[in-house]
Amino acid sequence: MKLYTYLNYGGNCRQAFEFYEQRLGGKITMIQLHGELPASVPRIPGWEDKVLHARMELGDTVLLGADIPTDVFQPMRSAYLTLILETPEETEQLYALLSENGEIFMKLEETFFAKRFGMLRDRFGTSWMLINEKPDVAR
């Protein structure tokens, strides 16, 4: 069994996936647009350039995503994508990149269980936890 995360965006899925590809080292393997739907499938007017389905390989996992109408889109509130990083420096670098123009929930700092731990919502509405675990606590 595999468990993948499917992220919804309020019209900026392509921008989010391109950002994650560039900044996190992912690889977009598919982007299908609403404009590519067969003519027999009902379409949302004006959504030809919006993402119907996207797929990105990121480390050992896969992120999936799509655009949804902005009147139903809400930023993530009850779940976080969690990055477990190898060094404090890598954690600090990615925290700075992801938090730019986003919202910080918990500043990046040392805790009793991690050399670095922080929580944020990025500019695209995706919530993240970044952790550089302490070796004696991680397992």
Where does each model-flagged region fall?
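Vicinal oxygen chelate
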Residues: 3, 29-32, 50, 57, ...
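Acidic/polar active-site rim loop that often engages polyanionic ligands
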Residues: 77
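Core segments of cupin and vicinal oxygen chelate
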Residues: 7-60
